[in-house]
């Protein structure tokens, strides 16, 4: 019997939606491994594919910016919601975004900043605010052959989701391209894709999904000769769930995000994206 805690059961229930007893059984059967327990539940048909919930983070705030061909995103973490939504804290993350936009993200902690360095300033802010404060995820895109856009979802007075996207093969002054880029960042915030294209999905992730779907299909009593075909069809559903280009556009699910962008003509394509949410890794 695997060793696990009540917290493990709660985490598994939260991520899979499975019942408490099923979660306990899954943890027992997999020696307490959370990822293995998720797969066990799915193979038994007791849970669907789940969005990666990730490690639970502290509180914090996110800010984003676009300045010409440069887009930047900074996550600043804190211990409490009270500090994270304070004017002092939100002002700091906004200034850090401007810093990253202007000076890049390399060696951020050592960069000169307001009479000291970024790292030292954040340490001073932690002392002033009375709790642990740190720089979380930092993303910066710079384009010369396309355009960038950003979106920040605000909740409780501070940014909790930040998105950046870069489109290549488009004119940054084209109104239609600008509109599509903004539609894409809004879509990413809502749909939480993991990958840009199918080729970006790691081989081990595909094999893990195929193994789970194969056993699930077999447990459903499907004819052995049909299993491979059924599994491949279900893998296509996996791609539609997690690959940005293949997701149905939130405003019109009959249209994929990839076709929305390619409809701009020429070599228009999604080059890359980033989505950061407070509380998720």
Predicted regions mapped to residue ranges:
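N-terminal assembly/interaction segments in proteins that build large macromolecular machines
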Residues: 2-281
């Amino acid at each position: 019997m695997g060793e696990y805690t009540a917290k493990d059961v709660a985490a598994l229930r939260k991520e899979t939606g499975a019942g408490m007893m099923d979660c306990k059984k899954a943890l027992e059967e997999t020696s307490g491994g959370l990822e293995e327990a998720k797969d066990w539940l799915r193979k038994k048909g007791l849970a669907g594919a789940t969005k990666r919930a990730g490690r639970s983070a502290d509180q914090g705030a996110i800010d984003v910016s676009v300045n010409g061909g440069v887009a930047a995103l900074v996550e600043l973490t804190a211990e409490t919601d009270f500090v994270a939504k304070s004017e002092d804290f939100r002002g700091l993350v906004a200034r850090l975004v401007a810093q990253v936009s202007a000076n890049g993200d390399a060696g951020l902690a050592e960069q000169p900043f307001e009479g000291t360095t970024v790292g030292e300033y954040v340490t001073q802010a932690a002392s002033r605010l009375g709790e642990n404060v740190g720089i979380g995820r930092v993303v910066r895109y710079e384009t010369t052959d396309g355009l960038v856009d950003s979106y920040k979802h605000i909740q409780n007075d501070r940014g909790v989701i930040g998105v950046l996207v870069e489109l290549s093969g488009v004119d940054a002054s084209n109104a239609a391209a600008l509109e599509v880029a903004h539609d894409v960042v809004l879509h990413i915030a809502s749909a939480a894709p993991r990958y840009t294209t199918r080729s970006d999905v790691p081989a081990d992730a595909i094999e893990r999904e195929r193994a789970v779907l194969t056993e699930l299909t077999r447990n459903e009593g499907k004819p052995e000769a049909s299993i491979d075909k059924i599994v491949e069809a279900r893998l296509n559903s996996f791609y539609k769930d997690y690959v940005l280009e293949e997701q149905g556009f939130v405003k019109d699910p009959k249209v994929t995000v990839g076709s929305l962008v390619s409809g701009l003509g020429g070599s228009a394509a999604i080059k890359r994206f980033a989505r950061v949410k407070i509380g998720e890794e």
